[in-house]
Amino acid sequence: MGFTVALIQGDGIGPEIVSKSKRILAKINELYSLPIEYIEVEAGDRALARYGEALPKDSLKIIDKADIILKGPVGESAADVVVKLRQIYDMYANIRPAKSIPGIDTKYGNVDILIVRENTEDLYKGFEHIVSDGVAVGMKIITRFASERIAKVGLNFALRRRKKVTCVHKANVMRITDGLFAEACRSVLKGKVEYSEMYVDAAAANLVRNPQMFDVIVTENVYGDILSDEASQIAGSLGIAPSANIGDKKALFEPVHGAAFDIAGKNIGNPTAFLLSVSMMYERMYELSNDDRYIKASRALENAIYLVYKERKALTPDVGGNATTDDLINEIYNKLG
């Protein structure tokens, strides 16, 4: 089974890390005979300046026909690109791994957590308005359908990992909305994996105190946004964290970090988060096709990255090295065989 990928370079360091990473994508296609076609589309700040839209209609036409979206970091127009794409294609699951990389020292030891965040509801639904002068109201939307749906995603991941799920909420205060989310998680998860619940403030503290206690965390949109950034930093660095936005018909893969305009054009941007997002993309392709070539490609790319970090010979300044983007890309490329 082949795939068409809409490739968005993004802004800031995005065009550098994406364009320089293309040779790795091409090599993996060749090594594993992957039938993947990449089609570049414009989106983000540069598209906004050129066309008056961060997500131009012509780009949307290409994205609509593509199977998967792969993007670099987008600048100030990120909400007009990523949030809009999530809404258009109902990409309801935000998957954020927080996994230690060999060669990056942290005081937390080996961390391997997967945060499964509901991506379409909660306060981020955007239902807010001014009631009167000096008074604003935001509506928190939680439905049983979306809550059960994200719990099922968490279950599927947990069954392939350590079979442990923590549902994170704040039902002791938000008894109705968070209570509904917790009830939905219980109905899907209890009895099928090692299941527990934790209030979000306790989860934030326990991530710092003992991150090894977590395997898969299933949570709401706002809590997941905050906890996933915290977990990524605990695992080593927010700057090397990948992510996926997954729906039934479309998926988007992107680095967690921003566009880093301050280092754009200096050839020191770190492509690791983008490349780990590519590894996640191959994993998704395997799930959709059941073609072993994709999972082999995913593991090979991840292993190549880990080998380079373990040797610490070509790391960029953000992770304690003095190498360039090109240096790191070259080392990963060579490790692929």
Curated annotation (Swiss-Prot):
Required cofactor(s): Mg(2+); Mn(2+)
Source domain of life: Archaea
Pathway given in the UniProt record: Amino-acid biosynthesis; L-leucine biosynthesis; L-leucine from 3-methyl-2-oxobutanoate: step 3/4
Sites where the protein binds NAD(+): G258, A259, A260, F261, D262, I263, A264, G265, K266, N267, I268, G269, N270
Residues that bind substrate: R86, R96, R117, D201
Compartment(s) where it occurs, according to its Swiss-Prot or TrEMBL record: Cytoplasm
Record field: catalytic activity: (2R,3S)-3-isopropylmalate + NAD(+) = 4-methyl-2-oxopentanoate + CO2 + NADH
EC code: 1.1.1.85
Cofactor binding comment, as recorded: Binds 1 Mg(2+) or Mn(2+) ion per subunit.
Record InterPro entries: IsoCit/isopropylmalate_DH_CS, IsoPropMal-DH-like_dom, LEU3_arc
UniProt KW keywords: Amino-acid biosynthesis, Branched-chain amino acid biosynthesis, Cytoplasm, Leucine biosynthesis, Magnesium, Manganese, Metal-binding, NAD, Oxidoreductase
Gene Ontology CC terms: cytoplasm
Assembly with partners or alone: Homotetramer.
NCBIfam families: LEU3_arch (TIGR02088)
Summary of the function given for this chain in its UniProt record: Catalyzes the oxidation of 3-carboxy-2-hydroxy-4-methylpentanoate (3-isopropylmalate) to 3-carboxy-4-methyl-2-oxopentanoate. The product decarboxylates to 4-methyl-2 oxopentanoate.
Membership in a protein family: Belongs to the isocitrate and isopropylmalate dehydrogenases family.
Protein name according to UniProt: 3-isopropylmalate dehydrogenase
Phylogenetic placement of the source organism: Archaea, Thermoproteota, Thermoprotei, Sulfolobales, Sulfolobaceae
